Amino acid sequence: LVCLVGSEMCIRDRSIYLKLASESNTYLFESMQGGEKWGRYSLIGLSTNNLLKLTGDHLQIIADGHVQTDLKSSDPLGEIQKFKDSFRVPDLPSMPRFTGGLVGYFGYDSVRYVEKKLATSTPPDQMNIPDVMLLVSEELIIFDNLAGTITLVVHADPSAPDAFNNFNRRLDLLEIKLASTSANPFDMTSGHQKVSEDSFVSSFGEERYKEAVRKIKEYTIAGDIMQVVPSQRLSAPFFEEPINLYRSLRRLNPSPYMYYINLEDFFIVGSSPEVLARLENDVVTVRPIAGTRRRGVDEAEDKALERDLMEDPKELAEHLMLIDLGRNDVGRISKSGSVEVTEKMIVERYSHVMHITSNVTGNVQENLTSIDIIKAVLPAGTLSGAPKIRAMEIIDEVEPVKRNIYGLSLIHI
């Protein structure tokens, strides 16, 4: 690992994001804490030709742009863990939690690698993208918005021939790229395309969606399920640069987890308040979020809406159910007696809404891996239901298309 720290002058040039986003297999992660102030760190992952793709039972490991390994496995997630175990990223106390490693997504349907009974009930796939896609992130730019610094991070194998000189060459190239005054590769005028509600096409259609809801209600009344979270895909043509969509989302809906990922054939743009799971210092954390009200126009209305939220029996019951679901997920991977609800029903405010949140932690069992943590918590209960497996069976029954990256989990390990 080699780091180079520069001054805040680099940070002020926001076009850094845009210069790098023109390349595939890059990403940008930003954060706004509580929806009200920017988080300390922003991360840019530079382009890589090393990645993993998993579709069905077919895993590809790509090195330097070429398929190095192409295999079918009954345990493809285990194969991903083996790949991760082949390298190590040092912990740096002066840096964010993540400074390189595997970055990408586990789609909603990656749960089928864990719950085998769901493997044969997958709805039709209209997107034809990998269920799991992970970039090997070896070159990063880390913005420290508090210290006013920018850090260039390069990872390489120290046992490789001429390793130190190679480090220096790569760092020099990054400095040149940052200092470049080349024209912006994007058309930033934005706004030429007008998208209305009529532009969107539903994967369901209104009547079929209503029928799906009726069927779910029948299952619920019969006691077969407590909650199911149905979804529908809404699609519309989009001709703007994808980075413009991210810029608009960043402005209109700033959240704790904002992400823009430029992959080979598609982009992922999103903004979320929810962490699925975090493993740090052998403590695993999940953070259930359920129960919502809009923000008030002033402090008095804001407080009135909070009181209404915290007195709503439906919202409280749903949140308690998700706490129980979180305790169950954490309990599967934690040492006996270590599971705790460290925060219970705290109202957090974001730019447009407020949510009820809780915090569930546990001391992770010895010899478990990061992939074991992911397997235990997929997918989020807020996007599936409870009991989770039965809810997903019903989702497969009523939804017309595979969810793909809807309900995905963005991963950095």
What kind of feature is each model-predicted range?
Residues 1-6:
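Extracellular interaction modules
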